[in-house]
UniProtKB/Swiss-Prot annotation:
DNA-dependent ATPase and 5'-3' DNA helicase required for the maintenance of both mitochondrial and nuclear genome stability. Efficiently unwinds G-quadruplex (G4) DNA structures and forked RNA-DNA hybrids. Resolves G4 structures, preventing replication pausing and double-strand breaks (DSBs) at G4 motifs. Involved in the maintenance of telomeric DNA. Inhibits telomere elongation, de novo telomere formation and telomere addition to DSBs via catalytic inhibition of telomerase. Reduces the processivity of telomerase by displacing active telomerase from DNA ends. Pfam families: PH_LRR1, PIF1, Pif1_2B_dom. InterPro entries: DNA_helicase_pif1-like_DEAD (IPR010285), P-loop_NTPase (IPR027417), Pif1-like_2B_dom (IPR049163), PIF1_helicase (IPR051055), PIF1_RRM3_pfh1 (IPR048293). Residues 159-184, 618-637 are annotated as: Disordered. It catalyses: Couples ATP hydrolysis with the unwinding of duplex DNA at the replication fork by translocating in the 5'-3' direction. This creates two antiparallel DNA single strands (ssDNA). The leading ssDNA polymer is the template for DNA polymerase III holoenzyme which synthesizes a continuous strand; ATP + H2O = ADP + phosphate + H(+). This is ATP-dependent DNA helicase PIF1. It comes from Rattus norvegicus (Rat). Its main location: nucleus. Residues 1-180 are annotated as: PINT. The lineage of its organism: Eukaryota, Metazoa, Chordata, Craniata, Vertebrata. Monomer. Interacts with telomerase.
Length: 637
């Protein structure tokens, strides 16, 4: 997210890491013979007087004497880095045959851990330093005294690392028991590929303010219109918090999967929350559920607009009862994200939804509200202004003219046609199945690999990919995960299947609207379920894209979209559909009727109060349109 107002938000650089560490001394056979557990420790990368790359381990308190380990032949195990765990195996005194020391890192903020490991790998790749000196040289030479923290990664080091990548085969064949040479290997780590992300993630001033409040332990609700970077910021927040005690949830399974969490209902363990409070408390006292409540220190809730007020109040009361604390929400820090002007809570029958901000406990649980105002998804100011008006239920003659004009847009090319957003999921399934059958040729089926096949239905509900993906030549598809942001291969990127590999699994080759043709390989999704258990699914990051539902599109950015709003049934639904498009040129609206643009008057009042508290008003967004706009309030209210 480039911007002139970007600021870095990390409190310390990528050469330091604070986490839990277990130090294990291993026998020559690899068996642990001594273990020391440190609940809070600091790891630092640096060099000694001989310019050797070192790792310093510092524990607080009386046992805080620092220990330094040479990194000449370090091995990294990073399979669980995404959940804040990793292992570093260091040969004792840098000699592989002398037994090893193993550092088991846990409860690391995942983003901090990723960048720490990246820095370690890169420094070893570009500046391995001299090999281990002989015993005579060590006795006669100066004693390595000082530990100097290494400098942050420089652009020149990135270029040098990219120019010195070793072939993967050489890494795999390197014998572990060979005699160490006097010249340290250029890359001693058993990794498949050196990935060089661009600069450190940056946040805007608004986003950085939210992160600072979160890291101070403040309960907060941050909001903003579609495309203001709420999901981006939420992922950055989760990467900055220790996994232990942090529970990531969302109101829907798909939204929960995007942040690697679980649904709010699954975490709470009280079903729909319709039962009396005493019964809900009893349900929450079941062993697995109760422990989850007790362990929770920070509760993240995404897509809050779809959470009903009564359910929020019930959760707040259950939290206090189970945790036996009188503080709001049982003392849990709340990190809440969403836009109440988007999709409302789902209710049965003619019952009107009550939004979370109407909950009795809302104000005491969420004392701070911050609004993101800078739009990142769309760059066209005309389109941004149009979406702002639609978000507030305003549909002037000019807005109507612009949206009706999109009916003539040709939003696809090179065999890629627009995705139709539907108000009902049944229409999506029927459309995709019908269009796939109409294509000639053989069906290519790709089955997912689930970590627990017995819980596949849970993964179906929370993953954006299904157990089975069926494709044909010419199938319209959409990426459902970021693969290479700099190349345009992002979540929501549209493409068409142009072939299949002749070997192996016959992986699909997809031509994307951005002009890139890519063979799509299996990726992994991880979700958290009740009791803290993690489930994973491996599948191609694709879904059929002739049609998709408005609900499942929430939070996505789409290249080319076709919308029919004739069956819109909820406030905010038209706005969510329209705001999925990255540009006005990539949007086609069929049979537009300005009466479908409406929003809930209670939500308007909530945001008006919020802005007035900051010395702003909703009218100040666009005074020219405000004078002629029609206020389309939901007629059911």
């Amino acid at each position: 997210m480039p911007s002139s107002t970007e600021v870095a938000t990390d409190e310390c650089d990528d050469t330091e890491l604070r986490c839990r560490v277990a130090v294990e001394e291993l026998s020559p056979g690899g068996q642990p013979r001594k273990r020391q557990a440190l609940r809070a420790a600091e790891l630092s990368l640096g060099r000694n007087e001989r310019r050797e790359l070192m790792l310093r381990l510092q524990a607080p308190g009386p046992e805080g004497r620092p220990r330094c380990f040479p990194l000449r032949a370090v091995r990294l195990f990073t399979r669980f880095a995404a959940v804040g765990r990793s292992t570093l195996r260091l040969p004792a005194d840098g000699v592989p045959r002398a037994g090893s020391v193993q550092l088991l890192l846990s409860d690391c903020p995942p983003e901090r851990l990723r960048r720490f490991l990246r820095t370690l790998r890169l420094k070893l790749a570009v500046a391995p330093g001299p090999g281990p000196a002989s015993a005579r040289a060590q006795l006669l030479g100066p004693r390595p005294r000082d530990f100097v923290t290494i400098s942050p990664v420089q652009p020149e080091e990135l270029r040098r690392a990219a120019a010195t990548k070793a072939p993967d085969s050489a890494l795999e064949k390197r014998p572990m028991e060979s005699q160490p040479s006097m010249e340290a290997p250029r890359w001693p780590l058993p990794v498949k590929k050196l990935r060089m992300p661009s600069s450190k993630p940056k946040l805007s001033e608004e986003q950085a303010a939210v992160l600072r409040m979160v890291l101070k332990g403040q309960s907060i609700f941050f909001t903003g219109s579609a495309g203001t970077g709420k999901s981006y910021l939420l992922k950055h927040i989760l990467g900055s918090l220790p996994p232990t005690g942090t529970v990531a949830t969302a109101s829907t399974g798909v939204a929960a999967c995007h942040i690697g969490g679980t649904t709010l209902h699954a975490f709470a363990g009280i079903g729909s929350g319709q039962a009396p409070l005493a019964q809900c408390v009893a349900l929450a006292h079941r062993p697995g559920v109760r422990q989850g409540w007790l362990n929770c220190q920070r509760l993240v809730i995404d897509e809050i607009s779809m959470v009903e007020a009564d359910f929020f109040d019930k959760l707040e009361a259950v939290a206090r009862a189970v945790r036996q604390q009188k503080k709001p929400f049982g003392g849990i820090q709340l990190i809440i994200c969403g836009d109440f002007l988007q999709l409302p809570p789902v209710t049965k029958g003619s019952q009107h939804p009550r939004f979370c901000f109407q909950a009795k406990s809302w104000r005491k649980c969420v004392p701070v509200t911050l609004e993101l105002t800078e739009v990142w998804r769309q760059a066209d100011q005309t389109f941004i202004s149009l979406l702002k008006a639609v978000r507030l239920g305003r549909c002037s003659d000019e807005v109507t003219r612009q949206l009706r004009a999109t009916a003539a847009h040709k939003v696809g090319r090179d065999g890629i046609i627009a995705t139709r957003l539907c108000t009902h999921q049944d229409d999506v399934a029927l459309t995709n199945e019908k269009r796939l059958k109409e294509l000639p040729g053989d069906v290519h089926s790709f089955e997912a690999i689930d970590s627990d096949p017995e819980l596949s239905r849970t993964l179906d509900a929370q993953c954006p990919v299904g157990r089975v993906l069926q494709l044909k030549l010419g199938a319209q598809v959409m990426l459902v995960k970021n693969l290479a942001v700099s190349r345009g291969l992002v979540n929501g990127a549209r493409g068409v299947v142009v072939g299949f590999e002749s070997e192996g699994r016959g992986l699909p080759r997809v031509r994307f609207l951005c002009g890139i043709t890519e063979v799509i390989r299996t990726d992994r999704w991880t979700v958290q379920v009740t009791g803290g258990q993690y489930l994973s699914r491996q599948q191609l990051p694709l879904q059929l894209a002739w049609a998709m539902s408005i609900h499942k599109s929430q939070g996505m950015s789409l290249d080319c979209v076709e919308i029919s709003l004739g069956r819109v049934f909820a406030s905010g639904q038209a706005y969510v559909a329209l705001s999925r498009a990255r540009s006005l040129q990539g949007l086609r609206v069929l049979d537009f009727d300005p009466t479908v643009v409406r929003c809930d008057s209670r939500v308007l009042q909530f945001y008006a109060t919020l802005r007035q508290g900051r010395g702003l008003s909703l009218e100040s967004q666009d005074d020219e349109e405000a004078s002629s706009d029609l206020e389309n309030m939901d007629p059911n209210l």
